Amino acid sequence: MQVPLCYFDDDPANSRNAAKTCGGAMYDIGCSCVTAGRWFFEATPQRVIGMIDLDPAFQTARLASALLDFGAGRQLALTVSTQAVRYQRVQLVGTLGRIEIETPFNPADGAATRYLIQSAGSTELRVVMLPGANQYALQCDAFAHAVRGKTPTAASLDDAAINLRVIEAVFASAKSGRVETL
């Protein structure tokens, strides 16, 4: 599984560039990549190795790459950046085929998301379009329903804590230069 997720923002007034509020690429958008891997593999990484480039002025991760090992041959390679051209993908490659999701995390308002599906042994790509939606309005609605007890939340605080442990392991690996075990 490969997940690049990048955007450009070098505004010192933006909280995503503030070290004191856990800004930077890993905290801001790396969590989306980690979540994608955990949901797809239905597991938590066992080991991680990471490389991080800090912005000299902000002291936040402006570029981070990590390899997350979920065991049993399941790996997620992610690259996130807050100072690169806007780009995002999720690519899943396996023995039976592959799936590529264009703009999986935040497509432009109302824009459809395209899925490309290829079966093993075929060069043909099947295209599936997911209709556009206002994802932020949907998130607010889902939150309101959860607060009112109408529906469960999509993720728990325990789930968020697991993601944070994975992200902190990426930082520890980048600092130590070694694989970190979770």
Give the positions of each predicted feature.
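A short glycine-threonine-serine/GTX helix/turn-capping micro-motif
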Residues: 21-28, 125-134
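C-terminal helix-rich "cap/oligomerization" subdomain common to oxidoreductases
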Residues: 71, 128, 145-182
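Short polybasic amphipathic segments
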Residues: 90, 108-121
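Contiguous beta-strand/loop segments that form the cofactor/metal-binding neighborhood of enzyme cores
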Residues: 34-107, 130, 137-151
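Predominantly a Rossmann-like dinucleotide-binding segment in NAD(P)-dependent oxidoreductases
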Residues: 1-57, 177
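A non-catalytic, amphipathic alpha-helix used as a structural packing/dimerization or gating element
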Residues: 32, 138, 159-162
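Short acidic, glycine-rich loop/turn motifs
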Residues: 68-72, 116-123
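Active-site/binding-pocket entry motifs
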Residues: 5-9, 98, 106-107, 123
